[in-house]
Regions:
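A glycine/serine/threonine-rich, flexible loop-to-helix segment
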Residues: 25-27, 80-82, 160, 167-194, ...
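A short, exposed helix-loop element centered on a Lys and neighboring polar residues
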Residues: 107-108, 152
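Catalytic loop of short-chain dehydrogenase/reductase
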Residues: 72-76, 83-95, 121-146, 151-160, ...
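Short C-terminal tail/terminal secondary-structure segment
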Residues: 132, 192, 196, 210, ...
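Short, small/polar-rich loop/turn modules that mediate ligand/substrate recognition or access, typified
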Residues: 159, 164, 220-222
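Canonical Rossmann dinucleotide-binding motif of NAD(H)/NADP(H)-dependent dehydrogenases/reductases
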Residues: 1-14
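Alpha-helical segment proximal to the catalytic Tyr-Lys
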Residues: 112, 156-157, 218
Length: 234
């Protein structure tokens, strides 16, 4: 949805895929002039370096917008997640690698091109579980909280180079690969608890990401925009 939102506004997009090559290729087929895809394993720094280099080569220009939205091996099913007594340090390391170390590496690889142009837009994907930890996603939430801190501290470092760094935090989305295991009654309960009586969709989250990359957000950096139908007040 994020890729399609940018393409719908005329942007050129390079999509990183790990296991979902077919999904990425479908988008490329729909926008053959402005979309490309390349393999990316966010757990591997060498893969990140290769992806960053290929992103510049595919359109003969350094990217000026980066969206960090990849997720490593996680299923949004509260009943199946380990509780405090059982969760392991390794599970925390896995999520920190995916949600903190990978965005850090992506930013470091693409920052020089942005700084050279004096313009860059970085959007990290967070979660509303910072404010509303109603399910035991301990490892996921902790890693995303670390990413929020990185968003804020990097906004200070990169601002003088013309680069903004922001975060968009959704709740449970209806529906993504990660939320496909979520029981229907959970979606219903969330919808009932929001002022808008709805569960946020991937398209709605994508529109918020698009805002941070747009001219309307040119004076905004270091911020976390919660997009969850009003369930959590940020």
């Amino acid at each position: 949805s994020i890729s399609r939102a940018f393409l719908g506004e005329g942007a050129r997009v390079v999509i990183g895929y790990h296991r979902s090559q077919d999904d990425a290729q479908r988008i490329v087929d729909d926008y053959p002039d402005r979309a490309r895809c390349a393999h990316l394993d966010i757990r591997d720094r060498e893969s990140i370096q290769e992806f960053a280099a290929s992103s510049s080569e595919l359109f003969d220009a350094a990217p000026t917008t980066l969206v960090n939205n990849a997720l490593v091996d996680f299923s949004f099913n509260g009943e199946a997640r380990p509780k405090a007594a059982d969760i392991s340090a390794e599970e925390f390391r896995t999520q920190l690698d995916g949600s903190l170390h990978a965005p850090l590496a992506m930013i470091q690889e693409l920052r020089p091109g942005m700084a050279e142009r004096g313009f860059g837009r970085i959007v990290n994907i967070g979660t509303n579980l910072f404010q509303n930890p109603v399910v035991p996603y301990h490892d996921y939430t902790a890693a995303k909280a670390a990413l929020l801190s990185l968003t804020r501290t990097f906004s200070h470092d990169l601002g003088p180079e013309g680069i903004t760094v922001n975060m968009v935090s959704g709740g449970l989305l209806r529906e993504t690969d990660a939320s496909s295991a979520t029981p229907a009654e959970v979606f219903d309960a969330i919808a009932e608890g929001t002022p808008l009586r709805s569960v946020t969709t991937p398209d709605e989250l994508a529109d918020a990401v698009l805002f941070f990359a747009s001219p309307w957000a040119r004076a905004v950096t270091g911020q976390n925009l919660i997009v969850d139908g009003g369930l959590v007040k940020g």
